[in-house]
């Protein structure tokens, strides 16, 4: 217990330290600039500036010498009142920019450069496909709604972009029934996204995702009633969520934009994520405050850590078609090594974002031999999902996800999974819910031989609440709790007992604050407005 507790503390310190150290030598696009620039900019009638670096001012159009962005003209805005005052660097102005109080585009860019990028039709780009806005980028090559919030820290290095984000949940969790358990642990992950422009229409990207789960969770993982998948000491795990590998993504991508509406990309990951399923649960805004994995993880998004992935796709406007070849085998029990790439499976996905607030996808995949204990197993997976995100104002957001996943395994037939998640944030307070129903075989639940071939519908109902203790100052630390009720058929009582299945936990949620380029910081993202 002492080693585990030490690992939890070390994980939290590592997350905080990495975010802090990355600021050294970087240009933070959210950093306020000197007020004397404001006076200088208004002495000239026509100048050009960089929205990320307002101190760059020229008398001709072109590209920013620091980051390579297209320079924008400084335009004088009309004041709505004669008493409008010059903008300041006060945080209240940063949080609630007023159009009537802005004296110029540059002055407001100093308050919130990302706001002006939207005002002029400019956006920060995805590291996978330069035609996509950064807010659309989910796990792997998946799409989120364009209005999704981004929690992370962005830095610019001479035109290159680096984004850091992640989360850690130091907690106490307690699960009932004979198969339950209680423990102190800390699910966690941290990710870096980097992109470099090779010209106006070509970009390369790289991503690194890591987790200290092997230290904080150990090989058995954490207790989670009715969860299944993977193994420990050559025995199948049941009623526990397996830990993730130390290295969960190491990927490179190359994207090309052919015109305003058409682009294409290639993506290679070792490990990486194929074009199969919705964005992985920890990357969905609707699940970002829930420390637990969904019970349908191995029906919906379990391929997010795959040792050997190659994906190609093209996007036209808000529609994307992509296909992958990848390794079907899930990670082995050694969470610190690189597994052998096989490229023996394939998948395809169709994604469509009809509005800024909606992301839809359908996908199919053939997965060969996903489990080491069942080398002859062949799995056909089909998924569909709808993600709806609604910004409600400054630091207020409502995100929802529906996922359906179906596995068709050799010798077992088809089993279904359904999930609904919702996350409502208002200021420092967040309330979230998750409902799911999954059909699992007795073999999956590791029951006795007479029940192995039977299918059992199991479900979970979760309600959680988080209150931020620190908020919006670079690192959000929230104190949270959640309660889950699990339902099962009476025929499972011989394994779980007669008691009600439930779980509760108390946790800290530690993550970077909302990035100012996130959708909730922009004036056009008011309640009910879509673009």
Where are these regions (language model features)?
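Transmembrane beta-strands of outer-membrane beta-barrel pores
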Residues: 168-176, 210-216, 268-274, 316-318, ...
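Residues on the lipid-exposed face of transmembrane beta-strands in outer-membrane beta-barrel proteins
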Residues: 152-153, 190-196, 250-256, 310-316, ...
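Repeated loop/turn-to-beta-strand initiation elements of outer-membrane beta-barrel proteins
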Residues: 162, 200-204, 260-264, 318-322, ...
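Outer-membrane beta-barrel "beta-signal"
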Residues: 498-531
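Membrane-embedded beta-strand positions of outer-membrane beta-barrel proteins
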Residues: 164-166, 204-208, 266-268, 312, ...
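Short Gly/Ser/Thr- and charged-rich N-terminal loops/segments
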Residues: 23, 102-110
């Amino acid at each position: 217990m002492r080693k585990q507790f030490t690992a939890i503390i070390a994980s939290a310190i590592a997350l905080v330290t990495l975010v802090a150290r990355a600021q050294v030598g970087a240009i933070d696009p959210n950093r306020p600039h000197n007020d004397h620039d404001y006076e200088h900019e208004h002495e000239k009638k026509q100048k050009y500036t960089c929205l990320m670096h307002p101190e760059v001012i020229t008398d001709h159009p072109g590209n920013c010498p620091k980051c390579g962005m297209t320079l924008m003209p400084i335009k004088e805005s009309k004041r709505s009142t004669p008493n409008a005052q010059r903008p300041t660097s006060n945080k209240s102005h940063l949080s609630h920019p007023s159009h009537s109080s802005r004296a110029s585009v540059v002055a407001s860019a100093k308050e919130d450069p990302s706001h002006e990028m939207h005002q002029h039709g400019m956006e920060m780009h995805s590291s996978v496909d330069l035609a996509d806005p950064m807010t659309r980028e989910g796990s792997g090559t998946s799409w989120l709604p364009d209005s999704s919030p981004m929690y992370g820290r962005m830095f610019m290095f001479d035109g290159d972009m680096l984004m850091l984000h992640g989360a850690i949940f130091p907690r106490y969790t307690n699960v009932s029934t004979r198969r339950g358990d209680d423990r102190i642990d800390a699910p966690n992950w941290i990710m870096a996204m980097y992109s470099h422009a090779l010209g106006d229409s070509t970009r390369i990207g790289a991503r690194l995702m890591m987790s200290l789960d092997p230290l904080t969770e150990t090989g058995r993982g954490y207790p989670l009633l009715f969860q299944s998948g993977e193994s420990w000491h050559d025995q199948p795990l049941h009623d526990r969520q397996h830990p993730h590998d130390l290295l969960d993504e190491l990927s490179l991508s190359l994207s090309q934009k052919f015109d305003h509406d058409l682009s294409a990309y290639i993506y290679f990951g070792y490990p990486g994520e194929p074009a199969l399923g919705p964005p992985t649960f920890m990357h969905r805004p609707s699940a970002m405050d829930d420390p637990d994995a969904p019970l349908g993880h191995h029906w919906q998004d379990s391929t997010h850590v795959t040792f050997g992935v190659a994906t190609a796709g093209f996007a036209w406007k808000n529609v994307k078609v992509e296909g992958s070849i990848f390794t079907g085998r899930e990670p082995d029990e050694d969470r610190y090594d690189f597994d052998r790439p096989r490229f023996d499976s394939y998948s395809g996905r169709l994604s469509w974002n009809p509005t800024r607030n909606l992301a839809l996808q359908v996908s199919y995949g053939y997965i060969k031999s996903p489990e080491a204990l069942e080398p002859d197993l062949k799995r056909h997976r089909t998924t569909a999902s709808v993600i709806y995100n609604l910004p409600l104002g400054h630091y207020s957001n409502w995100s929802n996800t529906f996922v359906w996943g179906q596995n068709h395994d050799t010798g077992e037939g088809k089993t279904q999974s359904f999930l609904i998640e919702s996350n409502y944030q208002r200021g420092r307070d967040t309330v979230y819910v998750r409902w799911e129903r999954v059909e699992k075989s007795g073999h999956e639940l590791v029951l006795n031989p007479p029940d192995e071939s039977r299918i059992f519908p199991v479900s979970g109902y979760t309600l959680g609440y988080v209150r931020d203790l620190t908020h919006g100052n670079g690192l959000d630390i929230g104190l949270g709790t959640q309660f889950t009720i699990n339902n099962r058929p009476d025929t499972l009582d011989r394994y779980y007992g007669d008691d009600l299945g439930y779980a509760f936990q108390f946790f800290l949620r530690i993550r970077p604050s909302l990035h100012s380029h996130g959708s909730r910081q922009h004036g056009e993202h008011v309640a009910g407005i879509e673009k």
